[in-house]
């Protein structure tokens, strides 16, 4: 009688929807669901590798553009250096002449200095702010030791060009080194026959040991496997051995780029000429270093401008001709330096573009590689379904919610919750389960 009453009570509870967590599938059904889910994961792996091949093409295109741009840089560098050499020659010839118009220039210089100091310190206090007291003392000494003749022949512009040339050479060398390191790794990665294999190849990414008789992508005699596996590796290759090397090489290439992007060469105080809108910061650094930045403000002082306009041709026509020659070569050198800077910015842009593509490559392929890193066992399924449970009425679980617990290779179990409309009978049931499981796995991978 007690047993009968217990059965009646259970039936009543069942009618009221109070039985939770009823397992609905057999072991055979779990295997079939695992097969269906593994096919979805297999397709996503193919998509990831197809994406990698696309990014590979973009990287190769960027690299070809970089090489072409490097040739233009070399030509521009030669022209710029020739112009700088002409400027230095003219400067040395002009310095060899006795200073003329001294009396006129010295009088103007004495009126120029106070204005230049006031203008410079006002700028420094407003823009640069820190250490104005020390900078003021340095500026006073600098102006007292400077010659109006240096001012008259645009010595500050010449020094600025020479400093820019040094900085540009340093930045180019750093970028070249970065590209050489990253490109070597990328070339090694992309030379593998893995990237030459067509995705429609029947050996490509078929699930391991599925019940139907299809050759799987880790088939021991596959050319793909031979290209990735050392001859010293015997026995059937694993998913881990297939993909983990790619992740490691992509990571190495990224590191080669990132190390250079954050290297001292790129953080050098005066490489700001590579960035737009950084002129004020550059002037601040020049003022702090040796006060020459203040000479850039000579256009704001009338008496300083008058020094540049002094005509000494009456006293020494040859010197006047040399000064004109110097100014002409200086203008050419400044124009070529600006052109070189623009090319260098384009070169830097290609470098940053390659770095961005490597990030995409890592994002596209990282989840596959991390799965490979987890996979050490012999399980024939990419995705294995452990349980499928449907919940009825409960305050914490919505009505008729289906919970599916799966594992991607050797990962920790992942629970996927599906609403009532996505039932086990739905043809897309396992595609939805696999998609959500993969999304959750990738989310956790990024968070780690």
Swiss-Prot record:
Most abundant in stomach, liver, brain, and testis, with intermediate levels in heart, ovary and kidney. Its main location: secreted. The modification Phosphoserine is found at residues 132, 395. One of its GO terms (molecular function) is misfolded protein binding. It is a peripheral membrane protein. It is found in: Secreted; Nucleus; Cytoplasm; Mitochondrion membrane. Pfam families: Clusterin. Changing residue 361 to R: Abolishes interaction with XRCC6. A motif (Nuclear localization signal) lies at residues 77-80, 442-446. Disruption phenotype: No visible phenotype. During myocarditis, mice show an increased tendency to cardiac tissue injury. Homozygous CLU aging mice exhibit a striking glomerulopathy characterized by progressive mesangial expansion and collapse of capillary lumens. Glycans are attached at residues 102, 144, 290, 327, 353, 373. PANTHER family: CLUSTERIN. Antiparallel disulfide-linked heterodimer of an alpha chain and a beta chain. Self-associates and forms higher oligomers. Interacts with a broad range of misfolded proteins, including APP, APOC2 and LYZ. Slightly acidic pH promotes interaction with misfolded proteins. Forms high-molecular weight oligomers upon interaction with misfolded proteins. Interacts with APOA1, LRP2, CLUAP1 and PON1. Interacts with the complement membrane attack complex. Interacts (via alpha chain) with XRCC6. Belongs to the clusterin family. Functions as extracellular chaperone that prevents aggregation of non native proteins. Prevents stress-induced aggregation of blood plasma proteins. Inhibits formation of amyloid fibrils by APP, APOC2, B2M, CALCA, CSN3, SNCA and aggregation-prone LYZ variants (in vitro). Does not require ATP. Maintains partially unfolded proteins in a state appropriate for subsequent refolding by other chaperones, such as HSPA8/HSC70. Does not refold proteins by itself. This is Clusterin.
């Amino acid at each position: 009688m007690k047993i009968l009453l217990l059965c009646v009570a259970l039936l009543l509870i069942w009618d009221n929807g109070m039985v939770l967590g009823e397992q609905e599938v057999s072991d055979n059904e779990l295997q079939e669901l695992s097969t269906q889910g593994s096919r979805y994961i297999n397709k996503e792996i193919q998509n990831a590798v197809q994406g990698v091949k696309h990014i590979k093409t973009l990287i190769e295109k960027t690299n070809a553009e970089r090489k072409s741009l490097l040739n233009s840089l070399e030509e521009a560098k030669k022209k710029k250096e020739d112009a700088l050499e002409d400027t230095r020659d003219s400067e040395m010839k002009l310095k060899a002449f006795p200073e003329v118009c001294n009396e006129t220039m010295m009088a103007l210089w004495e009126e120029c200095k106070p204005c230049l100091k006031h203008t410079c310190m006002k700028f420094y206090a407003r823009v640069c702010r820190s250490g104005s007291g020390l900078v003021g003392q340095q500026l006073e000494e600098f102006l007292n030791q400077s010659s109006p003749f240096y001012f008259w022949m645009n010595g500050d512009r010449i020094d600025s060009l020479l400093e820019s040339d040094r900085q540009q050479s340093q930045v180019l060398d750093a970028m070249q080194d970065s590209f050489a390191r990253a490109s070597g790794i990328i070339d090694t990665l992309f030379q593998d026959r893995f990237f030459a294999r067509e995705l429609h190849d029947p050996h490509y990414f078929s699930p391991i040991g599925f019940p139907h008789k299809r050759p799987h992508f880790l088939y021991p005699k596959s050319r793909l496997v031979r290209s990735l596996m050392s001859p010293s590796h015997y026995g059937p290759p694993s998913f881990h051995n297939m993909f983990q090397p790619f992740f490691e090489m992509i990571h190495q290439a990224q590191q080669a780029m990132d190390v250079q992007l954050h290297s001292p060469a790129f953080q050098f105080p005066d490489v700001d000429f590579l960035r737009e809108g950084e002129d004020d910061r550059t002037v601040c650094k020049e003022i702090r270093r040796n006060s020459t930045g203040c000479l850039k403000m000579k256009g704001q002082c009338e008496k300083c401008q008058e020094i540049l306009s002094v005509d000494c041709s009456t006293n020494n026509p040859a010197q006047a001709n040399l000064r004109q020659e110097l100014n002409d070569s200086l203008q050419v050198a400044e124009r070529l330096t600006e052109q070189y800077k623009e090319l260098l910015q384009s070169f830097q842009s290609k470098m940053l573009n390659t770095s961005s593509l490597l990030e995409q490559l890592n994002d596209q392929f990282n989840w596959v590689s991390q799965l490979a890193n987890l996979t050490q066992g012999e399980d024939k399924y990419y995705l294995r379904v452990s349980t499928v449970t449907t919940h009825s009425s409960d305050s914490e679980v919505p009505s008729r919610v289906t919970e599916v617990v799966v594992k991607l290779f050797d990962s920790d179990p992942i629970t996927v919750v599906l609403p009532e409309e996505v039932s086990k009978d739905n043809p897309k049931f396992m595609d939805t389960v696999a998609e959500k499981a993969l999304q959750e796995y990738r989310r956790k991978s990024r968070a780690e």
